[in-house]
Regions:
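Conserved HGGG/HGGXW glycine-rich cap/lid loop of the alpha/beta-hydrolase fold
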Residues: 11-66, 80
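Conserved acidic catalytic loop of the alpha/beta-hydrolase fold
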Residues: 71-89
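Conserved hydrolase catalytic core segment
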Residues: 87-134
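Flexible "cap/lid" loop of the alpha/beta hydrolase fold
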Residues: 115-160
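Conserved alpha/beta-hydrolase catalytic His-Asp/Glu region
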Residues: 155-229
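Acidic catalytic loop of the alpha/beta-hydrolase fold
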Residues: 216-217, 241-245
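Catalytic active-site module of serine/aspartate enzymes centered on a nucleophile-bearing elbow/loop
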Residues: 259-291
Length: 291
């Protein structure tokens, strides 16, 4: 699969575009890119036009402007949809891409027909708290600069990116993402090369920590209530061996979305159903979008 490029505003977005039919737009997670969707694209492209983009600062997309919120990335996706004249799309989001997609659904309801959320970020964000003796204090960071020095969740990954440390990044993924199955050697080499292209980790971690679409407070502040602006049907996967996005985050999303949402429990599956159960995932995506 070869990437194409299109300009949106001040950024150039790289993307994969495979197959024909109704458009399925795929939004990737943190430490990844469009290429991580290849197992799903391969299984869906005979029926759908599968488009997966590299978000700003990921993969081969530009990073001309920093960002503070997932709203800004959702705005990029909306501009991308318009630039390619896609019309309303079937949307897939994975991990952080689930958070970006929730924002897209809330801000641009006319652009999304249905949303399939794969182990997506919770509507109350993914907190990174201050540390004392390498233990979380539950206190929020006051700035990106302070968060960048977090000795557990942020700084080690920054050093991996700076060094292009393939071995350490692979070990991180093996320990946290691939908790059930492992990718092939060829897949891992390709996907890790894409992972190491990320340049925006601090922006992304800050945006995720501050995400709050609920009506409630988190240590980072009061939510904006934007979850109530979502109008489309949403399917949520809930994998029993995911140690990145815990079950309570998926349930928070499910409960907040009410009658719009359906819950899809995945047994013996970790944070990447694309690796742990790609056939089941593709079947569920197709059935949900075909209803």
């Amino acid at each position: 699969m070869e990437k194409k490029y299109i300009s949106i505003g001040k950024e150039e977005i790289a993307y994969l575009d495979e197959g024909a039919g109704d458009v399925v737009l795929m939004v990737h997670g943190n430490m990844s890119s469009s290429v991580h969707y290849e197992p799903l694209i391969t299984r869906l492209k005979d029926k759908y036009r599968c488009i997966a983009l590299d978000l700003r600062g990921f993969g081969d997309s530009s990073y001309n402007n920093r960002f503070d919120t997932l709203d800004e990335l959702a705005d990029d996706v909306a501009l991308f949809i318009d630039a390619l004249e896609l019309g309303p799309v079937y949307l897939v989001g994975w991990s952080n891409g689930g958070g970006v997609s929730l924002k897209l659904c809330a801000k641009y309801p006319d652009k999304v027909l249905k949303f399939f959320d794969i182990e997506g970020a919770g509507l109350k964000g993914y907190p990174v708290y201050q540390k004392e003796n390498y233990q979380s204090t539950g206190k929020p960071y006051a700035s990106k600069e302070d968060m960048a020095q977090d000795p557990i969740q942020v700084l080690p990954a920054i050093k991996c990116f700076e060094k292009g440390d393939f071995a350490t990044m692979t070990a991180i993924w093996d320990a946290t993402i691939y908790t059930v199955n492992k990718p092939t050697r060829e897949q891992n080499e390709l996907w890790m090369a894409e992972t190491l292209k990320q340049r925006n980790l601090v922006d992304l971690d800050w945006a995720l920590a501050n995400l709050n679409m609920s009506d409630e407070y988190t240590p980072y502040g009061l939510g904006d209530g934007s979850i109530h602006n979502i109008k489309c049907p949403v399917a949520l996967t809930m994998a029993d061996k995911d140690i990145v996005v815990p079950t309570y985050m998926v349930m928070d999303n499910y409960n907040a979305l009410g009658a719009l949402a359906i819950l899809l429990p995945y047994e013996n599956c970790g944070h990447s159903p694309m690796v742990d159960c790609p056939d089941k995932l593709a079947k569920d995506v197709d059935e949900f979008f075909s209803r």
